Amino acid sequence: MNIAFDAKRITNNATGLGNYSRFVLEALTEYRPENRYLLYSPSIGRPELYRELLEHRSVQLHTPHRALAFLGGSLWRNYSIPRLVREAKVDLFHGLSNELPLGLYRAQRVGTVVTIHDLAFIRYPQYYKPIDRLLYRRKYGASARAADHVITVSEQTRRDVIDIFGVEEERVTTVYQGCSERFAQIQPEEVTAARQALRLPQRYMLFVGSIEERKNLLLAVEALAQLQDKELHLVAVGRRTPYVQQVLDRARRLGVLSRLHLLHQVGATYLPGIYGGAEVFVYPSRFEGFGIPIIEALNAGIPVIGATGSCLEEAGGPTSLYTDPDNADMLASLIDRVLIDISLRRLMIDEGRSYVERFTPKRIARDLSQVYEQVMLTYE
């Protein structure tokens, strides 16, 4: 099968949708090598992000010819990709980041699949500009309704796509995200290298994600101040936004600024080692499409404390713990419990590793392939 992808995130985004997109291609190239995979991106972006993908003979990257560079990314993606896809005799096109090229809506004999990651802009409009909410609703909704099949990364998002966009239930399938297998194989020297290079504290709890209001890092800072264990620090790894100033101000006011470590633009090389050195992983986000950092932590053998109210229970499973995202006392109590109760800690680690076996690359490649094959049956 010839399968094409919108690769803008693969070539340009180091985290989030970029990680998801690269994971999908890594899983498919390893477990479905008989297919041909064509990546269409408006720019070469950051080659270090996808260099290993291009080592597979089944993968080809296509970017605009210099003569077409003036079109800009959006125009090229919406009007040139459909023509290129048909010329390449592509069987199926998968939009990995919430949308399909406009011209593909009317394309003949090309199956279409789109992944919708979340509808947070509808559920939590206060975190988005009005113009962004309008654009997202139009693009995501049009793509979901036009695609032959919609993939969601959680059951919660599946229900949202069905209820909000009116897509038929049989056209929406949940295929969970996964993470690199290197998080399950962290070596002691990786932990040491990360600790030395980044000057990490000896003992810490960990948060990974953008430092933005929706991720709710303030709750972790407030819990840090209430812990029985005053030797434990908080390490937060992620992109900074203006919200970071609120976090710093709160930490200063609570007297825990010296125990807060904000790491920005950390290389992917060090991330497994950072996980490996943590005693507990905290993720009090108010809303997520899924929660990949939770999967990474469980793979690394780190007890996870998430938050109620979205789909984090799907990512963390039944033996992870969950706090009310507005209750710092509750989060502090759960952290203390994980640190003190050795039996609980061992149970969370062992059961967590068993739970994340459902998010392996092999299983996800299988589930995606089943969707692709189902779509292509309608074109026979």
Feature roles, as predicted:
Residues 1-380:
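Carbohydrate transferase catalytic cores enriched for Leloir-type hexosyltransferases
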